Amino acid sequence: MFKDKEIWLDDEKRKKQLDKTADRAEATFFGFQRVARDRKADRVLQHFNSVAQHYDFMNTLLSFGIHHLWKRSAIRMLKLTPGDHLLDVCGGTGDLAILAARHLGPEGGVVVYDINRAMIEAGLHKVADKDIEDRIRYVQGDAENISFPDRRFDAAMVGFGIRNVTNVKK
């Protein structure tokens, strides 16, 4: 079936092969649609501008609510400690940031980093009535060109947004 099945049995070889293939591709996918690599970011931006106000509801509906369990599990896996600083890449409406902020205490903090202003704004109300408002900052920026220096954060995470990044290696 495969010419060189050894590639698929070795994690490093497999990743190199997949990266090489992705680097040569002129197209990528946005959902099930094939789009030019240089147009994907625009498509992602347009899509999330149009769904931002309903994104959280749609996420709950389409996952039958299980995304709440996935998110709590992801935060536990980070093993955050009070005082840590976390970067939430493609943080959108801030669900993961809110969960994380509860673990960080008053000395810690989370930066929600998302390219889409509409998604950020759609989530601002979720922290307004909680005691974590001063632990979460919002920065509009591109996940492929993060504008923070190395070692600025104790941890970084990306949730569902990873599927919308064209050049994951960046």
Protein language model regions, located:
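Class I SAM-dependent methyltransferase SAM/SAH-binding core
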Residues: 85-146
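N-terminal auxiliary segments of SAM/dcSAM-dependent transferases
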Residues: 1-45
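Short alpha-helical
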Residues: 69, 95, 117-118, 163-166
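Short, contiguous, helix-prone interaction/anchoring segments in small proteins
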Residues: 39-69
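A short acidic, Gly/Pro-enriched loop at the edge of an enzyme's catalytic core
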Residues: 144-156
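A short SAM/SAH-binding and catalytic strip from SAM-dependent methyltransferases
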Residues: 154-168
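Conserved alpha-helix/loop element of class I SAM-dependent methyltransferases that forms part
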Residues: 54, 64-84, 99
